């Protein structure tokens, strides 16, 4: 009986901890709407990506040319289990290597020696104020 009470108490505490983590707001705020792309002056070439960080299971932050930071939102939990040191894999779609819309970005992440392909839902250029507000560990 005593073991059952201890097990129930531990399970309750664990579920409260999970709920607290799930309720924690992202420092990024809500993601851009699905299908959101970039205005023509903010497009970039895939070979200009210099660094990245994985903000959460659906958000990748990329440094482009050492000047700009872009927020890429992916479908599902494509980035779950990935860490910042896991390489991202981009392929140029046929016709152009310029990324302006989600469909322009063919993205994957190499986790534990296996590639996971991601469906890009939105791309947004972050403002200097948004980048400055990021915690240090999230800055690409």
Please describe what each predicted stretch is.
Residues 22-82, 137-140:
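N-terminal secretory signal peptides
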